[in-house]
Amino acid sequence: MSRIGKRPVTVPSGVTATVEGQTVRMKGPKGQLEFVVHNDVEVKLENGAVKVAPRYETNRAQALYGTARAQVANLVAGVTKGFEKKLEIVGVGYRAALQGKTLQLALGYSHDVSYAIPEGITIAVPKPTEITIAGNDAQRVGQVAAEIRGYRPPEPYKGKGVKYADEFIFRKEGKKK
């Protein structure tokens, strides 16, 4: 079994890390993030690295400390590089456009879908069939991408809909006569 939690998360130069109780805060060039670690997990800042260890020898604590370490690593990646997801829109007449703080989506419905862009997330539309979502919080970037994809998920017959750029859509054959 992999024990990813045993490896400490190194804090690069230009990033300040603070640990207060169960709260880990990271501040870097892309902003500030914080994460509250579960009580079953012990978190310490030692020698410029954040170390995570299970507080108890229970299965729950063993499972949670690897997750906590991955979350702390995502904080470091978020404040240094940030995160980005790309969506593609496939279908005749399907397109996206930015209007101020809202994303307008024409997805084959009788009306356009308006999506209010949340704080801390930037959305770019390089082409009418491409959407780029960026931010420093991995969870929020993924959540926004999933919400936009949820308006018209790709269907298996023609592949029409909103899909992730690296997503493969399993295609089905239509019914035969």
Swiss-Prot record:
The keyword Magnesium does not apply. Keywords: Ribonucleoprotein, Ribosomal protein, RNA-binding, rRNA-binding. GO terms for biological process: cytoplasmic translation. Transmembrane segments: none annotated. One of its GO terms (molecular function) is rRNA binding. GO terms for cellular component: cytosolic large ribosomal subunit. PANTHER family: 60S/50S RIBOSOMAL PROTEIN L6/L9, LARGE RIBOSOMAL SUBUNIT PROTEIN UL6M. This is Large ribosomal subunit protein uL6. It comes from Nitrobacter hamburgensis (strain DSM 10229 / NCIMB 13809 / X14). The lineage of its organism: Bacteria, Pseudomonadati, Pseudomonadota, Alphaproteobacteria, Hyphomicrobiales. The gene is rplF.
